[in-house]
């Protein structure tokens, strides 16, 4: 008799999910940063409520209220890419520390202006922009260090914990802000936010990040930025994630952008806005646990699409409902749907991007993500200004539901490639009299293959897949040629801008790429022969 497959009971399954979620907390640095970040994010959400309520109190219309979120999101669109390049070039700990100090300084200035009464709508938007600019420079690096703090198998759980932390702050901060605003005035929220940066600064300053040896020459900001754009262009999975996230957030942004106006129409008290935003955060905390259970049963595409569809339905419901209790329930559901989509795509980007380009890829992800939010907030705010907030929310919700159809064209991957480096290529022995420098080039690299004639067709199919890898890692041109006199000989060629860039190619090759390389060489009769040719400029 064959053994029956084991199926865990619902109680065992729930216990397994819970254990997986909390496992990353075993790492002290991750745990300390997470705890410090809770207090910092609570302060951030308290200020967000304070800023939105202050804008309403200054008699600004829905357009100005929505622009508060635009001012928070726009810096990610403008600065995320160079910030990601810095995150891959500079010491990540020092960069995080610098940005935290900058944000603390701006928060102190903003708090002083609000408390003293010298604030105006445009000044509030400008300082919100400056504060968010620090966050834009920090976030790609902050997310890039996550794989350094937890094991690879705990990365999705760590992302979920970050989501729980963030949305726990979203649940606590707004409600606390509403109480403080009602009791002591709106300036209190800005003061609390300024003080909330102290914990993170202390933990980051104490963090002893291991030094990582780099064999390839360091990149420059412009070159690193171009390398990131090239990597995303030739990485199908990463590109699909980024496109999906940007389009979804364009429509999803309407719910939070117009929530202050919805709350103000329901109740004149700031507590109502804090309650609705708190319910959204509480729902996101619950959604993080639902995500772990759902991922064990359904594909990434199914879970993500379901989350977006539910979020769209919640947005439509907010456009219809008028009672505070009903709106609170809808926001609870919407928060859970929100975190399911965000956690999934964030963890996938971190897994798909190798360490050498991770901060830059995350920066591109944040650029499109926050760009979608910034554009969406402005557009749906303008629609709300002219056609009414309910109409704006209705169309945004329908648009969010429609984005689930993108899965037909850009499907989210269920499995991730092994992007660990596979630096096994033989380094050429260069004679001293050649005078080869790091900036010498362009460099023409050729790889000669002697192919088994019976497998020539399979070889060509496999080697043409190599083009995407070569271009992704730095090649500007690529080709495969067959020798007319010796039909079994094939020559692969690609050009790299400099010798330094070719050395970086050695570090960018991954274990997943090596699997394709082994497949290609399995069709050959001997070891491929590699040559490196350096461009020789005419002498003047």
Model-based region annotation:
Residues 8-16, 154, 205-230, 415-426:
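Flexible cytoplasmic inter-helical loops of multi-pass small-molecule transporters
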Residues 15-74, 230-278:
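Helix-loop boundary and gating motifs at the non-cytosolic
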Residues 29-49, 69-87, 91-106, 123-182, ...:
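Substrate-agnostic recognition of the 12-TM MFS/MFS-like secondary transporter fold
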Residues 49-59, 110-116, 172-192, 261, ...:
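Transmembrane alpha-helix termini and helix-breaking/packing motifs in multi-pass membrane transporters
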Residues 144, 148, 190-220, 297, ...:
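Helix-loop junctions on the cytosolic side of multi-pass membrane transporters
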Residues 416, 468-477, 495-531:
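An amphipathic, aromatic/His-enriched active-site/gating alpha helix that lines ligand/cofactor pockets
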Residues 454-478:
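Short amphipathic alpha-helical segments
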């Amino acid at each position: 008799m064959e053994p029956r497959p084991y199926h865990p009971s619902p109680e065992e399954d729930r216990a397994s999910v819970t254990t997986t979620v909390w496992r990353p907390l075993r790492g002290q640095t991750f745990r300390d940063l997470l705890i410090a970040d809770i207090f910092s994010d609570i302060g951030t959400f308290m200020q967000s409520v304070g800023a939105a309520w202050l804008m309403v109190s200054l008699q600004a219309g829905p357009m100005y209220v929505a622009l508060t979120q635009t001012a928070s999101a726009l810096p990610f669109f403008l600065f995320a890419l160079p910030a990601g390049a810095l995150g891959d070039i500079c010491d990540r700990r020092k960069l995080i520390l610098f940005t935290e100090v900058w944000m603390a300084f701006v928060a102190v200035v903003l708090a002083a202006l609000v408390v003293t009464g010298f604030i105006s709508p445009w000044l509030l938007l400008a300082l919100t922009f400056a504060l968010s600019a620090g966050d834009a420079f920090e976030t790609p690096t902050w997310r890039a260090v996550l794989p350094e703090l937890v094991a690879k198998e705990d990365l999705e759980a760590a992302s979920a914990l970050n989501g729980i932390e963030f949305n726990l702050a979203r649940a606590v901060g707004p409600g606390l802000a509403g109480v403080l605003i009602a009791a002591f005035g709106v300036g209190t929220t800005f003061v609390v936010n300024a003080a909330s940066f102290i914990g993170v600064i202390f933990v980051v300053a104490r963090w002893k990040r291991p030094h990582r040896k780099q064999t390839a020459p360091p990149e420059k900001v412009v070159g690193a930025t171009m390398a990131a754009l090239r990597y995303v262009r030739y990485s199908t999975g990463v590109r699909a994630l980024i496109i999906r996230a940007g389009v979804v957030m364009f429509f999803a942004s309407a719910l939070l952008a117009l929530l202050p106006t919805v709350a103000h129409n329901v109740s004149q008290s700031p507590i109502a806005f804090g309650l609705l935003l708190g319910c959204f955060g509480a729902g996101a905390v619950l959604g993080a646990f639902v995500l772990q259970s759902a991922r064990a049963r359904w594909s990434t595409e199914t879970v993500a699409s379901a989350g977006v569809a539910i979020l769209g339905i919640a947005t439509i419901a907010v456009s219809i409902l008028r009672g505070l209790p009903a709106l609170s329930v809808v926001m609870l559901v919407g928060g859970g749907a929100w975190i399911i989509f965000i956690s999934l795509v964030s963890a996938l980007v971190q897994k798909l991007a190798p360490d050498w380009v991770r901060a830059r890829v995350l920066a591109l992800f944040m650029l499109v993500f926050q760009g979608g939010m910034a554009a969406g907030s402005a557009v749906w705010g303008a629609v709300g200004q002219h056609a009414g907030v309910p109409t704006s929310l209705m169309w945004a919700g329908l648009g969010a539901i429609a984005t689930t159809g993108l899965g037909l064209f850009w499907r989210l991957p269920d499995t991730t490639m092994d992007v660990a480096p596979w630096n096994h290529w033989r380094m050429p022995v260069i004679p001293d009299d050649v005078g080869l420098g790091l900036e010498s080039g362009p460099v023409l690299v050729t790889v000669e293959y002697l192919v088994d004639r019976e497998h020539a067709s399979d070889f060509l199919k496999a080697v043409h897949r190599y083009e995407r890898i070569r271009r992704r890692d730095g090649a500007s041109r690529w080709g495969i040629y067959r020798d007319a006199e010796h039909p079994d000989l094939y020559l692969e060629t690609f050009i790299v801008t400099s010798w330094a860039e070719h050395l970086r190619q050695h570090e960018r090759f991954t274990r997943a790429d090596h699997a394709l390389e082994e497949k290609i060489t399995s069709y050959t009769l001997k070891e491929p022969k590699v040559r490196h040719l350096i461009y020789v400029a005419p002498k003047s």
